[in-house]
Regions:
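Phosphate-binding site recognition
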Residues: 1-181
Length: 181
């Protein structure tokens, strides 16, 4: 619920419709209201990625990311041929798609389209990691997610802000060396 609220607050898409959700609330009279509807928002939840092996886990990740790209299909019109190929490799779930950097690439595409930095919301970031630990493919999963999250949140010049939720302490997992905000 909190992540949805953040999405509705910041998302540049449907900003006028979303503004109505905050009418009559304290934030409506706050200086923060000037930020409402100002950013493209990438919202991804990993709550349903609970697979028994890495192959199935990665298949579900590809489907999830493809669906995310599908929701931003309109940005394709602003991409050059090389960028379009990168977008389409994910969109069509090709094996050669750069899934480790998919969120960072999507943030680049959105930044290019909207000419403003992007907010990334990741809900239940740790569900696939817990499942991987329980089912014996932790090393493969942690290797993927370390890059997936770091490229999106740590080394991303197109990022305005990122928010993650989960039950594991990020510092304990060692997923983000040097990412402590």
């Amino acid at each position: 619920l909190n992540m949805s609220m953040l999405q509705y607050f910041w998302d540049i898409q449907n900003q006028e419709e979303h503004r109505k959700l905050f009418q009559g609330l304290e934030i409506e009279h706050s200086p923060y209201m000037a930020e409402q509807g100002k950013y493209p928002v990438i919202f991804i939840t990993l709550k349903d990625i609970k697979e028994r092996n890495w192959k199935d886990c990665f298949t579900q990740i590809k489907i999830l990311v493809k669906n995310l790209y599908n929701s931003f299909e309109f940005v394709r019109s602003s991409l050059n041929p090389s960028e379009l190929r990168s977008f389409d490799k994910i969109w069509f779930e090709e094996e050669s798609g750069d899934y480790r950097n998919a969120l960072k690439m999507l943030s680049f595409f959105l930044k290019k389209y909207y000419q403003t930095k992007v907010i990334i919301l990741i809900d239940e970031y740790d569900t696939p990691i817990v499942s991987a630990y329980e089912h014996g493919y932790y090393e493969e999963a942690i290797s993927f997610f370390r890059n997936f999250y770091s490229s999106a949140l740590k080394d991303n010049e197109y990022l305005q802000m990122g928010v993650m939720t989960g039950i594991l302490r990020v510092a304990k997992e060692g997923i983000f060396s040097g990412l402590n905000n």
